[in-house]
């Protein structure tokens, strides 16, 4: 669940960002006002309790029928064969490619907790050369960059990914990046801000 990634960060969510644009709500730090639980139906309250303590969850609650399957997909993707480090690397890749500062900030916590190296994190954040990071990390970043930038994966690169992670691992990595690309699109649409105004991606050159 995304709650695991954003739990240490979500406590800051309800503070006001500095110099908010006029279309940004001061409580949510986004264009969407916070949904009030007591205004929901009993059925939707159950969904709210599962998803509403993360920013993507709060966005999805504007369409409750979508919120639960989105949460379930994310939860299942956390239990893949790839393990927590590769999961977090995939999430960071998606956040980087969409310049999604809020998503990056939340997943940076999870990546460090999972043991992703600082060199790998910086290679993703600043689009650095991959020669000095672990080979598996570099391969996953190449896979993600091909998907997001070229919109295709060469036969040679795909074969390398399959050799390293297996067919299932290759597919699961693509789904994880796709899931966080979906979240990034939703967060970009509502202009979700970091509560302290930090811009670790839009403030850094690719």
PLM ranges: what are they?
Residues 134-174:
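Acidic/histidine-rich alpha-helical segments that form the ligand environment
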Residues 60, 70, 74, 89-95, ...:
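Short alpha-helical scaffolding segments that buttress acidic/His motifs in well-ordered protein cores
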Residues 169, 178, 182, 186-206:
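Acidic, carboxylate-rich catalytic segments that either coordinate divalent cations
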Residues 87-124:
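Mid-length scaffold segments of soluble, non-membrane domains
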Residues 16-82, 205-206:
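Mobile cap/lid helix-loop segments that border enzyme active or cofactor-binding sites
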Residues 116-118, 124-143:
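A contiguous pocket-lining binding segment that forms or flanks enzyme active sites
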Residues 82-84, 115-120, 154, 166-167:
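Helix N-cap / loop-to-helix initiation motif
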Residues 2-12:
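Bacterial N-terminal signal peptides
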